[in-house]
Regions:
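Ser/Thr/Asn(+Pro)-rich, low-complexity disordered segments
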Residues: 1-93, 99-116, 255-583
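Extracellular polysaccharide-recognition and catalytic grooves
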Residues: 76, 80-90, 99-283
C-alpha cells in the first residue's frame, strides 16, 4: 500500500481511475484503515476529478481512464471503478471517514448515469457481467429496486443468450478472470437469493468450460482463445482463480498486491470439476462462441498435446489456432500460435496505443479465417484483407503483411528425413512442409497455399530469432512493405500424434508426406483438400463474402452446440440449475 500510495499521491499522466479506486478499496479493507484515512480522502479527491460531472456531456457520470485525459475515452472505466466502489460500500463503509464516505456516495450516485449511458451488448461478456453486478449492487446500496431489477433482467438475458450461443469471449485467459470476479461478487455480496443462485450456476458453467478445455501439462487452457494478450504462453488474470482453486501451484512468494479484492472475488469450484479436467483423456471439445455459424471453437486434448481451432477470427486479440505441447518449461512452454501480422511483431511483444484511451496492447490483424478439424488434424485458411476491409481508425496502419506460426524453441524441426540445423538465417521449407518433435509428440505442417499480395506463390520459411522469446516461427511473407490493395492468402494442414518412438516418428513423416493434397485459387474462391487419418478434409471458401461453399471431414457428430465434450452437451443443464457437475 505504501508503494501504491507513492504512485498515486501526485497522479502521473498514466495514473488510472481504476487504480485509484483499487487503492481506496485495499486501504479501507486493511487493518490500518484508520491510519490511512487521509490517504483514502486524497485518493477520493483525485478520483472525483476524473469523473465527468457535466450533465450536458455524453459521458456524464463516466470516468477518464487515465489522469491525462480531458474526457472519458474508454467508457468501460465506469464499470471497473464501480465494480470496486460498490464492493467498498457493501463491505467497508464503516472503515471510511465521513468525508471519504461522502465522496464515495457522490461517485456511486453519479456512476448510475454513466452506466446507463454506456451501451453494452450481451456478447461483450466481461463488461456485460460486470454491469450486471454493478446494477444489482447499486440497487441495494442506493435503495433503488429498479436498478436491481434491471441487473436481474440483464442476468437472465445473458443466461438465455449463452444457452443458445455459448460464451463469446471464449476461453480468454484474461477475461475469464474478470468474469469470475464479477460472478463471485454476485454470489457472495448481494442480498438477493434468486440472483445469487443464478450467479452460482454461471460460475459452475465457467468452471466446467475451463475443465473441458484444460491442458494439464501446461497448467492452462488449451485450444483457440478469444482475447488472449499472451501470444506465447496464454496466461493472465484467470491464473489467480486457478491458484485459489488449487489447479495450479504458484512458486511466487511475494505478498498479494490486492488481497482485499482477491478475497472478495474468490469462489472455489467443487473438486469433482477439477477431477473432470484431469480425466477423460483423450477428448474432443466443442463450443459455440457467438451467433453466426462460424462462431465456434473445437479442440482435441491428448496426454501430451492439445490442438484447437476456431471457425473465425473475431478480433485483434484472438488466438484462432493453438497447439499446446507438454514441454520442459511446463506452463511457460511456448504454444504453436497462428496469426497474421501487419507490424513486424511475430511474438506479440511490441505494444502500441490502441482504442479510445490508448491502452498499450499488441494487436494482430483480423483476417478472414475458416477451418475444419477432425480429431488431431486441422485444415485452416486465412486471407487478408477480410471480406469487409478495415479502416484502421484506431489501429496502426499496416507496414507489412506476414503470417506466423509461433513454435516452442525446444521443438526439434525436421525435413522428411533429417533434423534441420536451425540457424538465425530464414530457411525455406522443402515442398512447403516440415515436421516438429517434442518428447513422444510429432507434428506435421504442410502449407497448401502461400501467396503474396501479387498472387504469386512464396515459400514458408523457418525463422530462428534467437532465444529471447523461447520461440521460433514459420513465416509466410505476403508483403515486406505496406500491402496496399493486394490480398495475402495462406492455408495449411497440420497433423499431431503422440506415443511415438523413433520408428513411429519416421512412419508418421512418411504417412503425412504421402497424404494427397490439393489447393486451387480461382478468382475469389479457394478450394482446399487433404487426406486425413479418418478421411479427406475439404474446405472451399469464397474470399469475397466469407461464405463457406464446402466443408467436409470435420467431426460433426462431436460438434454439439452450445458446449459439448465427446458429443455430450453440458451447458444447458448447468444454466437451468441442475446439480450435475457438467460433462
Amino acid at each position: 500500500l505504501d508503494k501504491a500510495w507513492a504512485k498515486i499521491e501526485k497522479p502521473a499522466p498514466n495514473t488510472g481511475s481504476r487504480e485509484l479506486m483499487g487503492f481506496i478499496l485495499e486501504a479501507a479493507g486493511s487493518s490500518a484503515h484508520q491510519q490511512r484515512a487521509s490517504q483514502i480522502e486524497g485518493a477520493f479527491q483525485s478520483l472525483e476529478k476524473m469523473q465527468d460531472r457535466d450533465p450536458h456531456s455524453k459521458t456524464f457520470g463516466n470516468f477518464c481512464w487515465y489522469w491525462h485525459e480531458q474526457k472519458p475515452g474508454d467508457l468501460n472505466a465506469v464499470e471497473f471503478v464501480t465494480q470496486q466502489g460498490a464492493l467498498l460500500k457493501l463491505r467497508f463503509a464503516d472503515n471510511l471517514s465521513p468525508k471519504a464516505l461522502e465522496s464515495l456516495d457522490r461517485i456511486l450516485t453519479l456512476a448510475v448515469e454513466g452506466i446507463h449511458r454506456q451501451k453494452v451488448n450481451v456478447d461483450y461478456t466481461n463488461i456485460f457481467l460486470m454491469k450486471v453486478w454493478n446494477l444489482l449492487a447499486l440497487g441495494e446500496i442506493l435503495k433503488k429496486p429498479e436498478l436491481a431489477q434491471e441487473g436481474a433482467s440483464m442476468q437472465d438475458q445473458w443466461i438465455d443468450f449463452t444457452s443458445k450461443n455459448g460464451i463469446t469471449e471464449y476461453l480468454s485467459p484474461t477475461y475469464y478472470g474478470v468474469d469470475l470476479d464479477s460472478l463471485a461478487l454476485m454470489a457472495k455480496d448481494l442480498s438477493n437469493p434468486p440472483v445469487q443462485d443464478k450467479a452460482q450456476r454461471i460460475l459452475r458453467l465457467f468452471w466446467n468450460n475451463v475443465a473441458a478445455n484444460w491442458f494439464e501439462p501446461g497448467g492452462r487452457l488449451g485450444g483457440a482463445h478469444g482475447r488472449d494478450y499472451d501470444y506465447l504462453t496464454g496466461h493472465d488474470a484467470l491464473d489467480r482463480h486457478l491458484k485459489d482453486a488449487g489447479w495450479i501451484i504458484s512458486k511466487e512468494t511475494k505478498p498479494q498486491e490486492v488481497p482485499t479484492f482477491d478475497d472478495a472475488t474468490k469462489w472455489i469450484p467443487p473438486d469433482e470439476i477439477h477431477q473432470k479436467a484431469l480425466g477423460g483423456i483423450p477428448r474432443f471439445v466443442f463450443q459455440k462462441c457467438g451467433v453466426t455459424e462460424n462462431n465456434w471453437a473445437s479442440q482435441y486434448i491428448g496426454r501430451h498435446f492439445s490442438i484447437g481451432v476456431a471457425g473465425t477470427s473475431n478480433g485483434p486479440e484472438d488466438k484462432p489456432f493453438a497447439l499446446n505441447l507438454a514441454g520442459p518449461a511446463g506452463p511457460q512452454t511456448v504454444m504453436f500460435n497462428f496469426f497474421m501480422d501487419s507490424r513486424g511483431d511475430p511474438y506479440g511483444n511490441k505494444k502500441v496505443p490502441t482504442g479510445a484511451s490508448g491502452h498499450m496492447k499488441s494487436h494482430h490483424l483480423v483476417p478472414l479465417l475458416r477451418a475444419v478439424q477432425s480429431g488431431s488434424e486441422v485444415l485452416l485458411l486465412a486471407s487478408w484483407p477480410p471480406e469487409a476491409r478495415p479502416n484502421f481508425k484506431k489501429e496502426t496502419q499496416p507496414v507489412c503483411l506476414l503470417s506466423h506460426l509461433d513454435i516452442p524453441f525446444e521443438a526439434v524441426a525436421w525435413t522428411a528425413d533429417k533434423p534441420l540445423d536451425v540457424t538465425q538465417q530464414p530457411m525455406s521449407l522443402p515442398e512447403n512442409t516440415c515436421f516438429f518433435r517434442m518428447g513422444d509428440v510429432a507434428i506435421g505442417v504442410r502449407f497448401l497455399l502461400s501467396l503474396d499480395t501479387a498472387g504469386q506463390p512464396v515459400s514458408a520459411q523457418l525463422v530462428n530469432d534467437g532465444t529471447a522469446w523461447k520461440a521460433k516461427r514459420l513465416t509466410v511473407t505476403h508483403s515486406l512493405g505496406a500491402p496496399g490493395e493486394g490480398r495475402g492468402i495462406v492455408a495449411f494442414a497440420i497433423r499431431v500424434q503422440e506415443g511415438l518412438d523413433d520408428s513411429g516418428f519416421a512412419a508418421f513423416r512418411r504417412s503425412f508426406l504421402s497424404s494427397k493434397t490439393s489447393a486451387v485459387n480461382e478468382g475469389n474462391v479457394v478450394r482446399l483438400s487433404t487426406d486425413g487419418l479418418k478421411g479427406k478434409l475439404s474446405l472451399d471458401v469464397d474470399l469475397a463474402t466469407g461464405q463457406i461453399l464446402r466443408s467436409e471431414g470435420g467431426d460433426h457428430s462431436l460438434q454439439i452446440a452450445p458446449m459439448s465434450v465427446n458429443g455430450s452437451e453440458y451447458s444447458k443443464g448447468l444454466l437451468d440449475g441442475q446439480s450435475a457437475v457438467g460433462f
